[in-house]
């Protein structure tokens, strides 16, 4: 499979004002990373946006169970928005548990992208389904796209230094590459980020970039995807903008409040997701 980034030629592109996308999977599937990367790429493109990450309440919930599902929702728009959206227009479900946990929120006729390799009988039962939801009729109200993410990942990495179970750690890049194609997001920014993050592990960087491009190319080569979408740049006042989440906003508020009050800031916390960002922000002061 050609790993070069394809052009936008010969595609039917539909312009839409906004879209809400939710990525969902096991807490180890890298959905927060995928959502954050898509968000950052959209911000650099010029969209306005808002995000809503969601983490399992349980510590070390069993893999493949609803209790262990992690999700990341983002709304991008060509106008000023204030919320991460309500019902997602697109749901990426990495396993049956993610589908079970989030399907009811998906908008009617919404796009549903499934990691079909995860829909084994044991995983279907573990998620609480009595029958395979893909054949029971309960997905008939949606546009379903089944993607063999694990198979594609193994094929993409077969000539790399990554082996064994570590190979499937890159399957989230398949999802990110595909969504990047569907919404005409460039890959260059994510490639640069991957190279910087794994500059001491070039073999890992290479593997993730390969998977990213394979996911992107999958959208082109599979006939099921008839066209793509584009959300144009938002018309916002000129100035400098930055992406922050609630934790970083809270950190900045604590710093500003302490300085205005002339007090020394003290913060006590346990370093666990999703509160770790507060500690990471405050250690720099």
Regions found by a protein language model. Name each.
Residues 283-285:
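Conserved small/polar residues in nucleotide/adenosyl-binding loops
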Residues 101, 277-278:
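Phosphate- and divalent-cation-binding pockets in alpha/beta enzyme and binding domains
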Residues 209-210, 256-273, 279:
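Carboxylate/His-rich catalytic cores and anion/metal-binding grooves
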Residues 2-261:
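Active-site cofactor/cluster-binding pocket
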């Amino acid at each position: 499979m050609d790993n070069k980034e394809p052009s936008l030629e010969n595609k039917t592109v539909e312009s839409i004002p906004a879209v809400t996308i939710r990525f969902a999977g096991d807490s180890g599937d890298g959905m927060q990373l995928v959502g954050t990367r898509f968000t950052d790429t959209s911000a650099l493109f010029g969209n306005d946006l808002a995000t809503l990450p969601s983490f399992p309440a349980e510590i070390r919930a069993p893999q493949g169970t609803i209790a262990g599902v992690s999700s990341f929702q983002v709304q991008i728009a060509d106008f000023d928005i204030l919320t991460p959206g309500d019902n997602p227009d697109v749901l990426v479900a990495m396993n049956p548990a993610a589908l079970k946990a989030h399907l009811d929120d998906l908008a009617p006729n919404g796009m549903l992208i499934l990691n079909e390799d995860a829909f084994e009988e044991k995983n279907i039962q573990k998620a609480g389904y009595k029958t395979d939801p893909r054949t029971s009729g309960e997905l008939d109200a949606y546009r379903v796209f089944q993607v063999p993410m694990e198979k594609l990942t193994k094929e993409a990495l077969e000539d790399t230094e990554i082996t064994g179970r570590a190979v499937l750690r890159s399957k989230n890049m398949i999802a990110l590459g595909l969504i990047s194609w569907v919404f005409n997001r460039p890959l260059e920014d994510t490639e640069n980020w991957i190279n910087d993050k794994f500059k001491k592990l070039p073999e890992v960087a290479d593997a993730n970039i390969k998977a990213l491009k394979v996911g992107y190319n999958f959208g082109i080569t599979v006939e099921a995807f008839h066209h793509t979408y584009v959300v144009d740049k938002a018309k916002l006042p000129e100035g400098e903008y930055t992406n922050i989440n609630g934790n970083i906003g809270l950190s900045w508020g604590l710093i500003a409040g302490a300085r205005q009050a002339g007090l020394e800031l003290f913060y006590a916390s346990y370093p666990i997701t999703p509160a770790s960002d507060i500690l990471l922000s405050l250690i720099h002061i």
